[in-house]
Amino acid sequence: MTRWALSPEAADDLERLTDFLLASQAEHAFGTVDLVLKALEILADHPKVGRPIGQGLRELVISRGSSGFLALYQYDEAHDIALILRVRHQRELGYPQR
């Protein structure tokens, strides 16, 4: 079974998304983070499920209603680990730069 882990940046992204939702849709904030984390669990059994986007990166689409989230990750087949690099809402333009 593949292990998966959040990078510090991905953890920050989840915190940023939670803060945004607390300000705009408080009733959905924590449920949304749970939804994202639960969706990432699919990587344990299917680490290549995300669409390849080049440079060894993949993107997992996480549906929520009429929109959803995208998780950018890299799967290291040799070590059987999927590292979640970034998480963003589908309506955001690109991933935050650090």
Go through each PLM region and give its residues.
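Basic, Lys/Arg-enriched alpha-helical interface segments
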Residues: M1-R64, E77-A78, Q97
